[in-house]
Amino acid sequence: MRVFNFSAGPAAMPEEVLRQAADEMLDWQGSGMSVMEMSHRGKEFMSIHEEALVDLRDLLEVPASHRILFLQGGGLGENAIVPMNLMGAKPRADFVVTGSWSQKSFKEAQKYGTVHLAASGQTAEGFTRAPARSEWQLSDDPAYVHLCTNETIHGVETFEIPDLGDIPLVADASSHILSRPMDIAKYGVLFGGAQKNIGMAGVTVVIVREDMLDRAQSICPSAFEWKTVAENNSMYNTPPTYAIYIAGLVFKWLKKQGGLAAMEARNVEKSKLLYDAVDTSSFYLNKVERGSRSRMNVPFFLADESRNEDFLAGAKARGMVQLKGHKSVGGMRASIYNAVPLEGVKALVEYMKEFEQRSA
């Protein structure tokens, strides 16, 4: 029996994608091979690779001014790869810190240049808000401004993306990419690990504006230098072939669902249902300001934290798993990515109400 999986990542996958991957495991479309066995330069995999690129460009409406790269290293890897690729001429960057992931980015970039904290969403309650553009105190002529547009751990999402003029905006969109339409033209660089909404762990999507491909530091490894990767169509080294194949299946699934506008409508409905259950309760609490609440990652706390393990055990008995909050903040967290069905959120809300009544 399949469960409702609320994991923050690796996360729930569309069942249709899993079934197709299973059907094609031993023999991809009459090739007599699994995708795992294909040469990354063979015509079979090249067709998979190109279709994935085309479908992702269509879904996100990526303009011709931007290149799409398939890399490795995950979001954390990009915390080093980004500064090494952009601090060649200007070894300085600004950061808007809204949670744990942008904190890690801020710290990692210090190895490659000077960093400046332009704004922080930290309050006495922890990271609970996305600072407005009017609060950003930018330094003089930084190489870029870094922003994590969705903080997976704290459940903080940035919805208003400012136009910074000539200053490139770099966004870690790992945990909400493909959950809603985005104006890619506003970003110099946008990246995301795959294991949330893109597919399985192993591939990292980097979308970079063409004019930013030639700004790398000399220490940047060739395999992670965006210019080299772009010139070789993400084939400079052996790419994560199976992860790209799975991502391609997810992209086609998203298009069948109606694209990102349709996914946004679903995600608004799911997240509203869950936040309403928290807000109308005296037993559950979410600390994030309403205008900054993530649609993908919903953390909540029980009024009586001694009941946490009881809550998790009861949820598991009802077929709902991976609800434990991150160890750094505690409580609960429901990650409701694209592949988590509305029925799963309804089941969770029903259980939350039942558990509250039993705890009264």
UniProtKB/Swiss-Prot annotation:
Keyword Transcription regulation on entry: no
Assembly mode: Homodimer.
Name this polypeptide is given: Phosphoserine aminotransferase
Biological source species: Paraburkholderia phytofirmans (strain DSM 17436 / LMG 22146 / PsJN) (Burkholderia phytofirmans)
Cofactor dependence: pyridoxal 5'-phosphate
One Gene Ontology term from the biological process aspect of the record: L-serine biosynthetic process
Gene that this polypeptide is encoded by: serC
Reaction catalyzed: O-phospho-L-serine + 2-oxoglutarate = 3-phosphooxypyruvate + L-glutamate; 4-(phosphooxy)-L-threonine + 2-oxoglutarate = (R)-3-hydroxy-2-oxo-4-phosphooxybutanoate + L-glutamate
Compartments, as annotated in UniProt: Cytoplasm
